[in-house]
């Protein structure tokens, strides 16, 4: 996991087995940005949701294939508006970090500051329209 802010992290694919550890570490919500069947062996959204709920985590599925749409960014913004410690994940964390950045910028955040925060976490958003 890579910190995008004090309460938001981006991550590559999370395993259902890892979610109880995240809950124990203080995470309260998981946002799954992977479409089902993106690659062989990937857990389905239903499997991740069941594990998240069993661990006491709030779960949101906002599948993103490619560049996040404004509607997907808005859904991510809604998932983050209550400042619950949240891990967003996709295959590499890139789509999740892009959706996070688009969500913040749509709500008035400075694009350069958001890009800098993503870069500090290891995500290059220089080509993402914010």
Feature names for model-found ranges:
Residues 1-87, 98-130:
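Cys-dependent protein tyrosine phosphatase-like superfamily
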Residues 90:
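Short cysteine clusters
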